[in-house]
A protein has these predicted regions:
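N-terminal nucleophile
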Residues: 1-207, 216-218, 239
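Canonical positions in the second alpha-helix
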Residues: 231, 264-265
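Short coil turns that delineate tetratricopeptide repeat
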Residues: 236, 270-271
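Canonical tetratricopeptide repeat
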Residues: 244, 278-279
Length: 304
């Protein structure tokens, strides 16, 4: 039915789960993660309590192995369940019930577990592990590579439908809205993995752009512009990033360069021009900067 990976990143301490299934809206069912605690994947005739209870057990001090044993020993239908857990120490444990539909199995690695059931081939979970361990990238991209490797081996016997990815911080801050670093989901799609890959790329772009906010607040406009330009290079199709970069460049004194980007955004959607003036009303842009931008935009229009 499903293939997934749970993992802890040694360098950052982040925990993650990524999954793909021929099942509508897999995201609320399979991936569970809590900052500073660990991650759980529960699948194959899903017992949703494995997710929340598994995290509670980890939070109470259980190891991954102890938590998994507690879950399965109290489940009269453990033979149809598949579950994997990674704890705060990076220890992993997995269970593939004897009545999971074949091909079904799992493999454990250093800080991760790959598991699958109802696969076309029994090579899926090993291929996932190999892709995860040989990809040099952040945790999310390594998990993405694992999912793509599973699909390359034939994936779910029934086909493809939904996918999801969750990454949380290695240390909890008590602020869940900050601790949940990545939370992406493709609920129903003909090609869920390419769409998940696209969403991850856009998420990275906006995370990079987000770093520019702090730099701008501290007066480092050059640093902010560099971050925004990097974000734009990751997702050049995102009009908002083009507009944001252009405005920041104009504020920093490069009105000509900034106006080029703003003009490109306006050509895509003319309402971005109105946005310039609305930003002035809430003190996010100075009126003189907008006047200078408008002068450049008028000059560009005359040349066109």
């Amino acid at each position: 039915m499903t293939y997934s990976i749970v993992a802890r990143d040694k360098k950052t301490g982040e925990f993650g789960v990524a999954v793909q299934s021929h099942y509508f809206q897999v995201s609320p069912a399979v991936p569970w993660a809590l900052a500073g605690v660990g991650a759980v994947a529960t699948q194959s005739h899903v017992n949703l309590s494995y997710g929340s209870l598994g995290l509670e057990l980890l939070q109470a001090g259980y190891t991954a192995e102890q938590a998994l044993k507690a879950l399965t020993s109290g489940d009269p239908r453990a033979e149809v369940r598949q579950c994997a857990i990674v704890d705060a120490a990076g220890k992993v444990a997995a269970h593939t019930g004897s009545k999971c539909i074949p091909a079904a199995g799992h493999t454990l690695g250093d800080g991760f577990s790959c598991q699958a059931n109802l696969m076309e081939k029994d090579t899926v979970w090993e291929a996932m592990a190999d892709a995860f361990t040989t990809t040099d990238a952040p945790l999310a991209e390594r998990m993405m590579a694992a999912l793509e490797a599973a699909e390359a081996e034939g994936g779910d016997l029934r086909g493809k439908q939904s996918a999801a990815m969750v990454v949380v911080a290695g240390v909890g801050t008590g602020r869940p809205w900050n601790d949940r670093i990545i939370d992406l989901r493709v609920e129903d799609a003909a090609e869920p993995l390419p769409e998940l890959r696209r969403l991850l790329r856009i998420k990275r772009a906006y995370m990079t752009a987000g770093d520019a906010d702090h730099l701008e607040e501290t007066g480092d406009l050059a640093g902010a512009i560099a971050q925004l330009q990097q974000a734009l290079s990751i997702a050049p199709e995102m009009i908002e990033l083009r507009f944001m970069t252009g405005c920041t460049m104009a504020v920093a004194g490069d009105v000509d360069g900034g106006s080029v980007l703003i003009a490109e955004a306006i050509r895509k959607n003319g309402r971005w021009r109105d946005m310039l003036h609305r930003l002035v009303t809430v003190d996010l842009l100075r009126a003189d900067v907008v006047s200078a931008i408008e002068a450049r935009l008028a000059a560009v229009s005359q040349r066109i």
